[in-house]
Amino acid sequence: MATPVKKWLLRVAPWFLPVGIVAVWQLASSVGWLSTRILPSPEGVVTAFWTLSASGELWQHLAISSWRALIGFSIGGSLGLILGLISGLSRWGERLLDTSIQMLRNVPHLALIPLVILWFGIDESAKIFLVALGTLFPIYINTWHGIRNIDRGLVEMARSYGLSGIPLFIHVILPGALPSIMVGVRFALGLMWLTLIVAETISANSGIGYLAMNAREFLQTDVVVVAIILYALLGKLADVSAQLLERLWLRWNPAYHLKEATV
């Protein structure tokens, strides 16, 4: 059993490196080793964050970016899950869909930005389409992989107990594939923000990416850093949310049990 002190150290350990980096960053800025034209001090970044927050501009852009990300992820994730289920559960579905999907997956979706702008312009549809496209493939692949790697002995045993069709899917196939599906979700959440960052910096008139690009035009490096930190925090928040869902939905799986840390 870990002592309370060890438990506390394990909880705060992930913050040691970020706090150390910020401390060195502030020191380098204070003594003049780091020019504010290259990188503003942490104090300057906090001031810029407070100014943008007080004016409401930051929250407006944050809400728009979050809306784009969630809508795009919902569309792409749903399509990826459905197509993955079809390919994973049906050999004919795999023959019909998998080759085409794999060909599309090997085309970098961000390379389609010029074409997407021609199709949709710079309105919301373009960003949502790119996010949906970027999040579709990780969930599709991991859904297919999860279904195909279910222990066939479990499936046969369930059938011997009279399970088939939808009950078999709900009680055996879906729980067995869920760990792999959640891995796909976590990958997709990372790609969601990556795609949105690029899309908003190229074709947008609102959002955090637009805020950063607009600040660049006026050499406001503090605002650019605020935008970068926001993207990092949003990505971390999305990953933590996925981890919590894993622990909730997979609490029956010993691999996802919360264990006491031991040293």
UniProtKB/Swiss-Prot annotation:
UniProt keywords, alphabetically: Cell inner membrane, Cell membrane, Membrane, Transmembrane, Transmembrane helix, Transport
Membrane topology category: Multi-pass membrane protein
ABC transmembrane type-1 domain: residues covered: 58-242
Gene Ontology CC: ATP-binding cassette (ABC) transporter complex, substrate-binding subunit-containing; membrane; plasma membrane
Highest taxon of source: Bacteria
GO molecular function: ABC-type alkanesulfonate transporter transporter activity
Topological domains annotated Cytoplasmic: 1-13, 65-68, 123-125, 186-187, 239-263
Pfam families for this protein: BPD_transp_1
InterPro entries hit by this protein: MetI-like, MetI-like_sf
GO biological process: alkanesulfonate transmembrane transport; cellular response to sulfur starvation; sulfur compound metabolic process
Record's keyword annotation contains Aminoacyl-tRNA synthetase: no
Residues on Periplasmic side: 35-43, 90-102, 149-164, 209-217
Chief localization: membrane
Parts of the chain that traverse the membrane: 14-34, 44-64, 69-89, 103-122, 126-148, 165-185, 188-208, 218-238
Compartment list: Cell inner membrane
PANTHER family: ALIPHATIC SULFONATES TRANSPORT PERMEASE PROTEIN SSUC-RELATED, ALKANE SULFONATE ABC TRANSPORTER-RELATED, MEMBRANE SUBUNIT
Stated family: Belongs to the binding-protein-dependent transport system permease family. CysTW subfamily.
Function, as annotated: Part of a binding-protein-dependent transport system for aliphatic sulfonates. Probably responsible for the translocation of the substrate across the membrane.
Name of the featured protein: Putative aliphatic sulfonates transport permease protein SsuC
Species annotation: Escherichia coli (strain K12)
